[in-house]
Structures are given as C-alpha cells and as structure tokens.
Amino acid sequence: MKASDIRQKFLTFFETKGHTVVRSSPLVPGNDPTLLFTNSGMVQFKDVFLGTDKRPYVRAASVQRCLRAGGKHNDLENVGYTARHHTFFEMLGNWSFGDYFKRDALVWAWELLTQEYKLPADKLWATVYQTDDEAYDIWTKVIGLPPERVVRIGDNKGAPYASDNFWQMAETGPCGPCSEIFYDHGPEIWGGPPGSPEADGDRYIEIWNNVFMQFDRQLDPQTGEYTLTPLPAPCVDTGMGMERLAAILQHVHSNYEIDLFQALVSAAARETNTKDLANNSLRVIADHIRACAFLIVDGVIPGNEGRGYVLRRIIRRAIRHGYKLGCRAAFFHKLVDDLVKEMGEAYPELREARDRVVDVLRTEEARFFETIEHGMSILDGALGELKAAGKDEKQRMLDGELAFKLHDTYGFPLDLTQDVCRENDVIVDEAAFDAAMNRQREQARAAGKFKMAAGTLDYTGDKTTFHGYDQLLSETSRVTALFVDGASVPEMRPGQTGVVVLDHTPFYAESGGQVGDQGTLKAATVWFDVADTQKVLPEVFGHQGTLRTGVLKVGDAVGAEVDAVRRARTMRNHSATHLMHKALREVLGAHVQQKGSLVDADKTRFDFSHNTPMTPLQIREVEARVNAEILANASTNAQMMGFDDAVKSGAMALFGEKYGDEVRVLTIGSSKELCGGTHVARTGDIGLFKIVGESGVAAGIRRVEAITGDNVLHYLQTLDTRIGEAAAALRAQPSELTQRIVQVQDQVKSLEKELERLKSKLAASQGDELVSQAVDVAGIKVLAAKLDGADAKTLRETMDKLKDKLKTAAIVLGSVSDGKVALIAGVTADATARIKAGELVNFVAQQVGGKGGGRPDMAQAGGTEPDKLPQALAGVTAWVQQKV
C-alpha cells in the first residue's frame, strides 16, 4: 500500500466514524511561543484541551505534518543513520473532545489496523498504564488480545505518574494514561517486547499511541504531592507515525525503504551521481528535502536565529552530505520537483509554493557553496593533525575556538562540524565553542516598552467582549481585574502603573501587527491613562497605563474612551497595508507572502518574501495601484464565516497565523484577507498612500515602509521645502534642479581632474627637490621625508619618481591628513636583499602608533600619532646603517 493510500484510508475510516477531517496546521505553531515547531497532531488542538477554545465538532481526524529538529527533540545527528529517525514526519491522528473515550478509541484502532490495513492480529501487542484496568479489560475482553500480549507499564521514569504510559501536557493540568500499540517484526530481528530489558531493540516497534486525558493534575501545597482529579469531559488524543506504518504495510524494516523515501533517495542519487542507493548520505538528503521544503512552504526563511537558523542548519547539513558525495555545485534545490510529485497531491500548498521553495534553496546553496570548500579544508586539516598526534580516540577533541571560527567565518553550524568530527571519532570542545560565542554575543538589551505575553499575568476571570469595531466609547465598562508589577491587586492608587482588565471594551488589543489602542478610563474621581492595550490571554484584553487620580478598585464601573485621532490614523495605515499586499502580489508575483508587519499611527511597515530589491518602477506601480483603489472609494465589508468557506471565497490566510474555525473576512477594494483588525469604512478614507522606504531585512525578505493620509501631506510639504532650499542654493528653479545638479557634477569632475594634474605636478617638483636630500649608506641612497598635503596616490607617484632618479635606494615618505599618518616605503630591486620595505615602513609606523606591511620592494602603513612623525623619519638613516 502506497503512502498516499495510507493517508487517505486513515481519513476515510474516521470520517465514517463521525469525525471531521481537519487540515494539517503549518509547521510554525500559530500564536504559541512555547513551541519552535509543530511536533505532534494535537498541537493545533492544544487550546481545546486547555478549555480556552471550542470547535464546532467533538470528533476530529487529520494527517499532520510535523518537525522535530531543535530543543529537546533535536535528533539531527541520528537522521539518515537509523531506520526511523526523521526531521520531518507525518502524524495520523484522531481526537475526541469530551465525546467517545477508551472503548471506542481502542476498538476503532484495532478495526482500522486489522480490517482496513490488514495487519496480522498475531503481530500486534499493546501496553497500558499499570493501574488502567479499564484499558486492559478492553484489550483482553472486548478486543480479544491475549493477556500475554498486553503489558502493564509502571512508573519507569523515577517519579509518580512518570511513565511511558502516562501522558501529561505540563507539570500540572490535563493528563492521563495512554495505551500504545506495537508491531512485532519477528524473531529474526533483535529485541524484546515492551517493558522488557530488551525493549530498546528493533523487533517490537510502537506504531500508535492512544492518550486518554481523564485527570487534572495539581500540586497539593500542604503535602507537596500531586493529586489527580477526574476531568468533567475526558478527551482522546491519538497519534500514529505514517512512515512507520508504511514500512510495515510495504514489508520493509526501515522507513527509508518505503515508496515515498525510495523516490527521494533515487532523486538524490541522480543529482549527486551516486551509485550506492544504501549510502547514508542519500538518506540524510532525502529526509532533509522534506523538512526544508515544508518549512519554506510554511513561511520560514533561512536566517541566523530561531526557526530560520534551524532551517539553515538542515539545509547546510544536506549540502555537506552532498559535498561528501562529490558535489561541488548546487544540487539540493533540484529535488523539489521530485518531492512535489510524491507529496503535492496530499499537500497542495507544496505545489503552489514550488517556485518559491526552489528559489530560497538555490539562494542558500549558492551562499554556502562559496565557503564550504575552504571550511572543509580547514576542518579536514585539523582532524588530520589530531589523528597524526596519535592520541587515543577518547582523547581526540577539536578546539572549540576553531569550531567557532568555522561557524562565524564559514557558516558551519556547530552540529555540522560535530557531524564531520563524529565520522572521524573526534569530539568538539563545546565549552570553548560556547565561550567564544558568548564573547561575540551582544550583551546590551533594548529597554522595550511593557508587553504582556500571553499567560504572564495570573488571570482566571471571564473573557473581554470587544466592541471597538463600531464605537470608541463605553460608558459602563466594569473592572474585572487589576495588576501591579505583575501581581493581582484589589485596588490601584495614584501614580501606580499597571494593567486593568475590563468586562467589555472599545480598546483594540495589539494583534496581527496592529498596535494596541491608547486612551483613558474615567470615573467620578478616577483618571487612568491607557498607554497600550495587550492581550493577557487570547480573549482577555489588558489596558496598560498609569493611574493619575482617584483610587481604582476591582468591580468599579468606568468609562472607556479610545484616542480617536490615533485610532483613525492607525486604521488608515492598516487598510492601506491590505491594499499594498494585494498590489505587491500583482506587481512582483504570487510568491509574495507577508512575513511580518507593524501598523501604528505613523506608518505601516510590511515585511514580505521576495529575493531582490524593488525597482523604482515597481515601487511607483504599487503606489499607483493602491491610490487607484483609494480614489475608487469602495466600501469596506467585514463578515464572519467558517475558515474553509473563507478560503474557498478567495480570502487570503497568512502563514504562521492561528485561525479558529470561524474567522473574520475583510474585503476592502479588490483585497480580501482574514483579519481581526480595525479598518476604515471606505477606501477613500485613507486619503493618499506613499511608499517612503524599501530595504532588505534578511535573506529573501524585503521591507516596505509607507504612510497615508495627513502623514503623506506632511511628507510632501517637507519634501517640497527641501527641494526649494536645494534649488535656491544652486540658484535654479525647482523644475531645473536635475539639470543644474548635472552641471555641478560635471564641474566637480573637471575640478577633480585638474586637482589630480596639479598634485602630480607637485609630486614631480617635490621629487626633484628631495633627490638632493638623499644620504648614501653603503651604496644605498636613503631618503625619509614628509610631504605636506599629499594623499596616498601622490605618495605612490612621488615614490616611483624618486626610485627612478636615485637608482639604488631605500625611501620612506609620510604625510598627515585629518590627524592620521600615511606612510609608504620603497626599496629598489637591487637593494631588497639587504633592506626590506616592510621592515622599513614598520620601523617608522611603530613610532607613530601604527603598523603596516607589503612586498619587499613596496610597503604601506598608517599611524595615529602625527606629532611623532618628524622624529620617526629622522631615525631612518641610522636604522638602515644598522641593517647593512
């Protein structure tokens, strides 16, 4: 059974069991700073399990793309060398949110495996938590699995409920026992059944884990022990590795032998011209193309930090393995079409992003191939020296400073260097590497404004109702919580800065790139200045600011009023951002995707995927398209609809954003996006749009800054004033300014040429005058002189003329400009055996606070102490006498 059939059969089976088939979420978790990447199928349902979100369904099934490469899930060194380690993998999963529980979950799992996938029943084993009699009885009495093939697993991780068969999301919160299903590959493969001392072998392989969240785990402050309280609505969370299941169904032992991987391994062999299809490097490359391609699909760009650096590490590891196979030019990006062929039907977004993926990989390959050969030469040389030293394998350690140099200068991620060292039985001195890294890392931290990251304030009250789309004033909002210095307080006093949570508010909390509102909260004697509005929790708004007068208490009623002028300017910029995004895609191409934005009252700053700087013509075209939309004065429409319906209607969803099942669709002009921000009523309200900056912020990421409305008027008035001042300075009309500037530039060029001619003439005359100052030392004419006003070029020209005239000579010339010393030394060819120009110039340079170098016949230097130059030059003759 092919991998594509395995996916579809899983989804179809659970659809017949009343499950809603849910699309895979991106590899970048939306609005979850605790996770680097989506690493399991349950990630997109985390808020449901925590009770902070609800879905219109109680049963779900999906095939989730996952990535484990970083943090505690960093198995990168094993990928390609074991049968089942991967960076990217697919997780088949089904979920129940307070609906069915253990019996249905296990019975359906058994039915799917034995009746649909046709796995031999006598090859399957199960494990349960040691006290989970319910699951044990379902396996043995309902399903009929022999008791000897159902293993109870206890607390095997050193603490109560710390077990392979007891799952918990965190130290406290939802948790419960789990039941794992194993497949027995047969006695010809070493290993023992689960729970036995030989369980780490490859004979018995876990294929499906069924987690039963039925308890709330909390710490008893009196006893210091954890307690388990039954949840009112138990849930089911299951996960089965698609690649492991495919290996079983296709009768192979290694995941790399399934049809999907065999196609990618063959493609890697083709591009690297490798005959041995069992080569581990081919497996590394085949694994990594999946991870890299889908990371790029989901909006990650290679960079030097965070997710971008993980992507860069994986790309460069693949390139290094290609280099190991003999590749000396870019090859990795050529595998994208093979991947699209294998996985494009299951993931249409991969096919749609094909050109962008190829472009990003090609660019990153070109960058690394510029340095990999030199870096590998240095690393191979160091490894050769370690081996030649004859040290015991356990004592072979690569200098951490060298590893850092490879990282800093040649772009070798540490784990790439460790990979190469591991192949040569050498370890890297990580402590020294870390020390070098820390020395380089900047210590200064910007004092940013107060921010409330989700979950940093201990709030347990009701959600905030937001009604700020159509009104900016609430006369009867009630205070539900107060926080000062991060702690909950019953009241706030004048002068204190803190956070106010209201039951309903017109204040927009920062989200989607739009800054939070400012304004005031007022009561009879209370005046609270709101400096910012942030989300305490996904649907709880915190008004951060300072209490000016009165005493504010929890339960008080206040009037909440948004700064209308600031909000209006912010709305103009936000609406213009949508129109600009649409125009950028039309002008530059459909590969343009939003990578970040900041919308405030002054400007909109928009980061997007694009590899080259925008041309002036492209900028003008984007401006023209946006302003045409503004002049059309089209009305803005916002409506709520299901996510799938929204996407089908043509609304653009942004990668990396987390959307619920019901979303707000904003139509403004020809733009249609999912957006929860505040916007103008009509496009004409924007007034005018102007791009004021375009730059690169990272590889493959461009940034545009733009302004709208009265900010454009102020910008144009300021520009007009500056043009007028420039015209007056050049004694021209503004309309003649370009022509006048060209004339001035021509005059400057002419004067520069005349200046060069005069300097050359001066050098010649000075050279004639200096010849007579030369002193004969053992047949060498020695001359040391200072040339006032001479630049480096004049010094060189004078030096050449003096060498011609003096024949056998050693000469030092110096000059001073802007407090800096410039030196040049020249020695004729027939004297270099006795005097070296480099030594001569350094003799002088060291006395004036500098150093230099060069060839035996010509050398240059600089210095920072011009007052010492005359004395230094005066000692040249004596120095030459000592040398000869």
From Swiss-Prot:
It is found in: Cytoplasm. Catalyzes the attachment of alanine to tRNA(Ala) in a two-step reaction: alanine is first activated by ATP to form Ala-AMP and then transferred to the acceptor end of tRNA(Ala). Also edits incorrectly charged Ser-tRNA(Ala) and Gly-tRNA(Ala) via its editing domain. This is Alanine--tRNA ligase. The lineage of its organism: Bacteria, Pseudomonadati, Pseudomonadota, Betaproteobacteria, Burkholderiales. The gene is alaS. Keywords: Aminoacyl-tRNA synthetase, ATP-binding, Cytoplasm, Ligase, Metal-binding, Nucleotide-binding, Protein biosynthesis, RNA-binding, tRNA-binding, Zinc. GO terms for biological process: alanyl-tRNA aminoacylation; negative regulation of DNA-templated transcription. InterPro entries: aa-tRNA-synth_II/BPL/LPL, Ala-tRNA-lgiase_IIc, Ala-tRNA-ligase_IIc_anticod-bd, Ala-tRNA-synth_IIc_core, Ala-tRNA-synth_IIc_N, Ala-tRNA_ligase, Ala_tRNA_ligase_euk/bac, DHHA1_dom. GO terms for molecular function: alanine-tRNA ligase activity; aminoacyl-tRNA deacylase activity; ATP binding; tRNA binding; zinc ion binding.
